Design a protein with these regions (language model features):
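Metal-dependent phosphoesterase signature
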Residues: 1-7
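Asp-based, Mg2+/Mn2+-dependent phosphohydrolase catalytic module
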Residues: 9, 13, 19-132
Length: 132
């Protein structure tokens, strides 16, 4: 059973109206069996990628679903400093770090933009990324 953070479904619904969303997971849950599954155009699991994030295979498979975009035009949202942030950053993908625990940045590469609450996600993306 997967419990969603407050505001996740509303944020995904709002974002799916303007963006193509994909789920990249190291887990084994079928995103399409969850209430939020309808907002995703594609989902890539570790089984499909034959590896786990931060390995670039997840991100390369996502790119195949987005053939008209460059990595630099993509935005990856994740909560893990290595699996999500480092993995995407290594390919030049913009990253937005979900830091709901207000953890300290412990890596030796650039700290990405961060957010703490899913209710604010759509506004943050609009303010920080739509004009870039």
């Amino acid at each position: 059973e997967i419990e969603l953070f407050p505001g996740v479904e509303d944020a995904l619904k709002a974002l799916s109206e303007n963006y193509m969303l994909g789920a990249l997971t190291n887990g084994n849950a079928d995103i399409y069996k969850l209430s939020i599954g309808k907002y995703f155009e594609f989902s890539i699991s570790s089984l499909e990628a034959q590896n786990s994030k931060p390995n670039k295979s997840h991100f390369e498979l996502a790119k195949k679903h987005l053939p008209n975009l460059k990595y630099s035009e993509m935005l990856h949202i994740g909560d893990h400093q290595i699996n999500d942030v480092f993995g995407a950053h290594a390919l030049g993908i913009k990253v937005l770090w979900f830091n709901n625990t207000e953890a300290l940045w412990e890596q030796n590469f650039e700290k990405p933009d961060q957010f703490y609450d899913w209710h604010s996600l759509a506004k943050i993306i609009e303010e920080k990324y739509e004009s870039r």
